C-alpha cells in the first residue's frame, strides 16, 4: 500500500496521516489481503506480544488508564410510559468529529463523541483488546474521553477532511437545504424534561431529499411540524409507510428526560460533498435530551463493519473527487479504511480475535417535524467523476 501516494492525493498534512505513513514501513505490503478479515472472522489469533508494538508510537504512547465511563444512561426501574401519540424528530445538525458541537475546529473533537462500547479504556499500550490488522498503528484503538470508542473520528476523519473541506459545515449546510437526514419517531415520550419511564418505542427512518416529492418542490425544510420528510422505501419493512420502520427500538427508555434507544442496525446518511454515503452502523445506541420540544445534545454510537465501510466508500468516493480515479490510489484509500478497525462487529473487543469493525460516535441536534407519511422516489446519485 502506497500511503505516501494517498497522502499526496489528499493533501492531508495531519499528524494522523503522517503517523499512518510511518506505519507503511512496518510491513504493510498488501493490507487488502489482511482486510479479508473485515468480513468478520472470529477465528482466534495469537495475542500481541506486548505493549511495545510500534516504535513510531511508543515514544508518545498514552499513559495507561483504569477509569471507566462514557456510558449512556442505564435502564431505570420505572413503570412503562403511558404517554400517547407519536412524536417525530428530524436531525438538523450532525457533528462528524472534526469540530466540537459549538463548531470549533479541533484535532481532538472526536474524543467527546460516542460511548464506551466495549467496556474498556484503551490506549496504544493496551493488550486486552482485539488484534489490529497488520500495519495498523498501535494507537489505532486509542479511546477518547472516558473510554469513548470513536475510531471513525480519530482515524477516518482526516481522510474525509482531505476529500471535503469542512465536512461538518458542508453536512449541516446540506441538511439546511434539504439533503437526506434521519427521522426518529417516538411513541411514549411526554416531552417532560423530568420524565423517567420504560416501554418506549423508537422508529428510525433514513429520508430522501426534502424536495424530492411534489409537495416540497422548490422548498427547503423549516424543521417545524409543517415539514413532511419523505422516507426511503428501504427504511420501511416492506417498501410502504404502512408496513412500519425497518429499524425499530422496542424497549427504549427515558431517564430524567434523557432518551435511550438501541438498534441492531441503523444506516445514517452522511453528506460527502454532493454525494450521500450511508454509514452502515450496527449495535447502535442513540441518546438525546428532551429540551424545548426537541431532542437535543444527541449522540449516535455504534460500529461500522470494516467490509461494509469499504463498500460504502467504494460507492461514494468516485462521486466526490477525481483524486481516486487511479485504481491504485483508490485501493490505498480502502486499505486505510480497513486499517482503522478497532473493535468487533458485535461491539466487544477480545484479545483472541482480530478487530473487524470501526467504532463511531456522532453528535446531533434535532427538531420536531410531521409524522412519516410519504415515500421518497429512488434517489439519483451525482455523476461518477471517473467515468463522465
Give the role of each language-model region.
Residues 1-9:
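Bacterial Sec-dependent N-terminal signal peptides
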